[in-house]
């Protein structure tokens, strides 16, 4: 008999086991035609879990309920993986972070989320206490992640899977960018993990809510219908006042960068030159760049990742940079970038070069892309020939770069 997961699609608790199954090579079938409120109240389901909660995993040895227990079972099913650590102390630390995530993150986040969604009565003091406790948990997690890529050891464990599934619900519902920006290492960790193939296969494309849901309003009681009076002659209806009609949609506000004085440098021309130059790159593309470059209308910036000591695993480092470039998509019209991942083994160094419209890094990028805070930014002085040559080398992916091999070079254009 195959393992069968009984729950509705997208259940946070079930996702823990489904992601663990991807890492552990365990096959799990998801029950067809599951209807919450119907299937879980049936006699057959109640035999598996007497209180009717989901998820439930049906196994050849019998059913299992409680999501962390299910995830633990799946993570050990094949035995040949690192989800539970490589030593007794690592196993204990994994269990420690699972408990921490459940009690300090998930429990407090649900106390904030449930009333806002109408699943529980709303109380402002209770919400304030829940948010305060959640912040305390996130601060502790942020401190740990300042010097650790994963919660335990140097690879994904069950602790990471459980924690990310808990955080994912918060990011999707109540934890806005304004809220999470106080915890940059948690943000980096979350976006790095959800972009791993095993997580992405189960969670899809993770998104962050833009606003906290409003408090549900209670329906006011309907007033008693007054007794009908004899009908009077209806007054002549007035023509509707134009001012009371729907307002015409307001024109979309222009990006401040569109209001800058015109520049002789056309960014799309540079991007085409970069993409189409297949040989003699230094003589054609690099020379063309410096011929085009307008220091009045554009600025060049070096960036260096602040936490290179964390970059011990190549694929995690590459995904970290890839996630950064994805989140820079909102700036594509106004920027060009090169990101170099340097080194033949960890810790890998991440260095970048960016061309931005305007004399400074655009404010909307600093506000919207949390990764910006994870880098040291230095404006390029093109009167310094050494800095100018460094720009040229970064554009052409020169190797070795500053004495180190290139693990990869990524271009944003």
Swiss-Prot record:
Domain EF-1-gamma C-terminal: 253-413
CDD domains: GST_C_EF1Bgamma_like (cd03181), GST_N_EF1Bgamma (cd03044)
Domain GST N-terminal span(s) in chain numbering: 1-82
Chain segments carrying region Disordered: 207-260
UniProt xrefs under InterPro entries: EF-1-gamma_plant (IPR044628), EF1B_G_C (IPR001662), EF1B_G_C_sf (IPR036433), Glutathione-S-Trfase_C-like (IPR010987), Glutathione-S-Trfase_C_sf (IPR036282), Glutathione_S-Trfase (IPR040079), Glutathione_S-Trfase_N (IPR004045), GST_C (IPR004046)
Pfam families assigned to the protein according to its UniProt record, in alphabetical order: EF1G, GST_C, GST_N
GO molecular function: copper ion binding; glutathione transferase activity; translation elongation factor activity
Keyword Protein biosynthesis applies: yes
Keywords: Elongation factor, Protein biosynthesis
SUPFAM superfamilies, per database record: eEF1-gamma domain, GST C-terminal domain-like, Thioredoxin-like
Subunit comment: EF-1 is composed of four subunits: alpha, beta, delta, and gamma.
Function per UniProt: Probably plays a role in anchoring the complex to other cellular components.
Name under which the protein is recorded: Probable elongation factor 1-gamma 2
Organism of provenance: Arabidopsis thaliana
């Amino acid at each position: 008999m195959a393992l069968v997961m009984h729950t509705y699609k997208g259940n946070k608790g079930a996702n823990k086991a489904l992601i663990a199954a991807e890492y552990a090579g365990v096959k799990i079938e998801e029950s067809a035609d599951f209807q919450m409120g119907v299937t879980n109240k049936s006699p057959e389901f109640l035999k598996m879990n007497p209180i009717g909660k989901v998820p439930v995993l049906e196994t050849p040895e019998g059913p299992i309920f409680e999501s962390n227990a299910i995830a633990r079972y799946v993570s050990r099913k094949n035995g040949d993986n690192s989800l539970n650590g490589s030593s007794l102390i690592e196993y204990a630390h994994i269990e420690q972070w699972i408990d921490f995530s459940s009690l300090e993150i998930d429990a407090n986040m649900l106390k904030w989320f449930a009333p806002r969604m109408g699943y529980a009565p709303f109380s402002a003091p209770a919400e304030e206490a829940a948010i305060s406790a959640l912040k305390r948990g996130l601060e502790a997690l942020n401190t740990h992640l300042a010097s650790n890529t994963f919660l335990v050891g140097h690879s994904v464990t069950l602790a990471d899977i459980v924690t990310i599934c808990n955080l994912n619900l918060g990011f999707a519902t109540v934890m806005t960018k304004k809220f999470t920006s106080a915890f940059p290492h948690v943000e980096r960790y979350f976006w790095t993990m959800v972009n791993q193939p095993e997580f992405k296969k189960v969670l899809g494309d993770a998104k962050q809510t833009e606003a906290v849901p409003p408090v549900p309003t209670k329906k006011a009681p309907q007033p008693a219908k007054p007794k009908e009076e004899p009908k009077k002659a209806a007054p002549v209806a007035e023509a509707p006042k134009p001012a009371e009609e729907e307002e015409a949609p307001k024109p979309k506000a222009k990006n401040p960068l569109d209001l800058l004085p015109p520049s002789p440098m056309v960014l799309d021309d540079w991007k085409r030159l970069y993409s189409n130059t297949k040989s003699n790159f230094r003589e054609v593309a690099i020379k063309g760049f410096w011929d085009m470059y307008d220091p009045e209308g554009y600025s060049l910036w070096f960036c260096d990742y602040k936490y290179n000591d964390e970059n011990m695993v190549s694929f995690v480092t590459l995904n970290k940079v890839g996630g950064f470039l994805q989140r820079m998509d909102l700036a594509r019209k106004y920027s060009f970038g090169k990101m170099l991942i340097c080194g033949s083994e960890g810790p890998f160094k991440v260095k970048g070069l960016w061309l931005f419209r305007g004399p400074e890094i655009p404010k909307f990028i600093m506000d919207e892309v949390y990764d910006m805070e994870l880098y040291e930014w230095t404006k390029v002085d093109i009167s310094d020939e050494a800095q100018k040559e460094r720009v040229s080398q970064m554009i052409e992916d020169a190797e070795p770069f500053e004495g180190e091999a290139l693990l990869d070079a990524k271009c944003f254009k």
